[in-house]
Structures are given as structure tokens and as C-alpha cells.
């Protein structure tokens, strides 16, 4: 509690780390740090999660027009299917020790810089392609990330012109992000 006349300030990194401590350590959730840091920092950033538990944050600098164009290519839909993120993430964590899963994760990490460059250069088609390839790899990480209904929604979006699509969060349901030319919305 702040004393009278004193203002307590917290920085974004502290807020992200405290959110992780609560979910990971206190609640014992088998999750990563991405969501907490994204919420704490806001905006467009590259987050690099290091082996020593530190996090490097690199803002992606684009002008307002580019940000508007980037946003215009995205559509987010709630597709239902409430699920337990913990069970999917727990399974994914166990599976990620397998060599083929490690390679998929390394490939997904390798997309980060190319995705940032595609945003900076306004290469929206490449953004969609990277999102799509990322989703393809994500589905291979564990059972339960996708299902026939999610695959059907994905196929429908692609059929109607989406360059890429992915499920947000752990998988199994929730929100589906499509990245497509605005005229295809």
C-alpha cells in the first residue's frame, strides 16, 4: 500500500516477472512467460527468453500507417471449445523433450526475426505465410492443440483467401487469428 504522498511505480519488466511468479510458481501452472510479458509491455515487441530466466525485450518500431495496415490484415474470431490450457501445455512440455519436437520448436523460434522484418518492410503476405507455417508446427507439438472442428475453420479461412491462420493460446479452442488481405475479409 502506498503511503500518503508517496507514489509507488513499477516497471513493465517487474510486472511481467511478477505475473509469471504468480502463475508458474504460486499456482504451479505449466506455462511459459509469453502472455504475461506481452500483457505487461503491450505493443509490438520481440521477447527473447534466455536460459538464465532473464527476458530481453526489443520493440518493433513502425509508423502509425504501417501499424494500421498490419491491423487491417488481422481478423480474430472466438471459435468456442472451452478447454484447459494446463493439460495441453503439460502434455506439450513432456513432448518437447523429444528430438522431433525440439526441432519444431527451434524452427518456430527462427521465425521471430523474419516475422519482425516482414512487419517492418510491410510485407503482409510474408507475415501471413509465417503465421501459417508456425501454426503447422504448433499443431505437431502435442495432441489436443487442434481438432477436426479447428481444422475445418482453418480450411474455410484459407479457402476464402487467408494467407495464414493460427489458434491463440495453448490450443484446443478459444480464438482463431486469420491474416488475410483486407479485401478478403
Each PLM stretch: what is its role?
Residues 171-173:
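Glycine-rich nucleotide-binding loop
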Residues 3-30, 34-167, 177-185:
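C-terminal nucleotide
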Amino acid at each position: 500500500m502506498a503511503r500518503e504522498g508517496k507514489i509507488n511505480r513499477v516497471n513493465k519488466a517487474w510486472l511481467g516477472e511478477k505475473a509469471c511468479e504468480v502463475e508458474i510458481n504460486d499456482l504451479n501452472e505449466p506455462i511459459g512467460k509469453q502472455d504475461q510479458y506481452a500483457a505487461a509491455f503491450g505493443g509490438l515487441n520481440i521477447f527473447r527468453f534466455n536460459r538464465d530466466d532473464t527476458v530481453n525485450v526489443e520493440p518493433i518500431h513502425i509508423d502509425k500507417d504501417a501499424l494500421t495496415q498490419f491491423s487491417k490484415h488481422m481478423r480474430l474470431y472466438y471459435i468456442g471449445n472451452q478447454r484447459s490450457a494446463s493439460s495441453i501445455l503439460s502434455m506439450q512440455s513432456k513432448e518437447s523433450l523429444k528430438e522431433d519436437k525440439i526441432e519444431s520448436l527451434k524452427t518456430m523460434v527462427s521465425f521471430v526475426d523474419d516475422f519482425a522484418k516482414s512487419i517492418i518492410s510491410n510485407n503482409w503476405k510474408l507475415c501471413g505465410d509465417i503465421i501459417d507455417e508456425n501454426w503447422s508446427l504448433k499443431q505437431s507439438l502435442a495432441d489436443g492443440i487442434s481438432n477436426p472442428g479447428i481444422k475445418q475453420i482453418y480450411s474455410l479461412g484459407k479457402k476464402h483467401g487467408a494467407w495464414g491462420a493460427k489458434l491463440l493460446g495453448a490450443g484446443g479452442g478459444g480464438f482463431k487469428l486469420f491474416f488475410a488481405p483486407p479485401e478478403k475479409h
